[in-house]
């Protein structure tokens, strides 16, 4: 798709919409998700915003340089934000737009990423994970299927043939497999793709900068 110019990520859920947290609440999972002492200063960014940001970095290979965030709490009976809209600048000059929300009624775990470049764009949707849409600036739209012929890289992370869903747990299996291979490998030049503590540090820095930006209502570097 050429030089990357714009990245758009949205990840929406609805579990916190209209929720009321009290001592009699039987849904204990909601308690820790909205407990600042446990989850941190942001409900939406700590839970799903990290996934959105890491996904954009992984797919594009780019790192953010500055951002402007607008954090919002839509539910009256909770103490943490559940909606975040973030404008991003990347190191190569590309722009980004993020929307993550856990109070979007009807939001069915809708994780979607679109990356636009000088020669076209790609789009991937979590609810239809086996397919990647390639939109060339010139020519017809192409739908690339998981494990398609010639996709050596994706085949390394696939355990079933094309047309069959991998399943959620296989994502963890890919991480374990790469870590084990890295430990046992004698090839020091081989590049591995599993996330490390460094990626965790980057996302933690991203979250804190979003919180500071929203509070100060200004662009911040990170």
Predicted regions and their residues:
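Alpha-helical packing segments of well-folded alpha/beta enzyme cores
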Residues: 52, 175, 179, 203-207
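C-terminal glycine/acidic-rich active-site capping loop/insertion
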Residues: 23-29, 33, 85, 90, ...
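Short, hydrophobic secondary-structure boundary micro-motifs
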Residues: 4, 67, 191-196, 220-222
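Predominantly a Rossmann-like dinucleotide-binding segment in NAD(P)-dependent oxidoreductases
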Residues: 1-78, 132, 217
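Short arginine-rich
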Residues: 206-216
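Glycine-rich, aromatic-lined ligand/substrate-binding cores of catalytic
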Residues: 46-67, 72-121, 127-130
């Amino acid at each position: 798709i050429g030089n990357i110019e714009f990245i758009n990520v949205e990840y929406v859920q609805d579990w916190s919409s209209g929720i009321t947290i009290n001592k009699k609440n039987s849904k204990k999972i909601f308690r820790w998700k909205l407990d600042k002492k446990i989850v941190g200063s942001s409900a939406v960014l700590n839970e799903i915003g990290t996934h959105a940001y890491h996904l954009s970095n992984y797919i594009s290979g780019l790192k953010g340089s500055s951002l402007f965030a607008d954090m919002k709490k839509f539910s009256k009976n909770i103490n943490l934000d559940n909606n975040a809209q973030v404008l991003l600048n990347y190191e190569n000059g590309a722009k980004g737009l993020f929307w993550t929300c856990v109070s979007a009624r009807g939001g069915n775990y809708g994780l979607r990423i679109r990356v636009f470049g000088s020669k076209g764009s790609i789009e991937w949707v979590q609810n239809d994970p086996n397919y990647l849409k390639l939109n060339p600036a010139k020519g017809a739209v192409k739908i690339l299927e998981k494990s398609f012929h010639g996709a050596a890289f994706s085949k390394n992370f696939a355990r079933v043939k094309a047309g069959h869903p991998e399943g959620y747990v296989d994502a963890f299996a890919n991480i374990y497999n790469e870590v084990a291979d890295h430990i046992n490998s004698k090839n020091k030049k081989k590049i591995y793709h599993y996330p490390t503590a460094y990626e965790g540090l980057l996302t933690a820095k991203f979250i804190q900068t979003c919180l500071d930006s929203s509070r100060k209502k200004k662009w911040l570097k990170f």
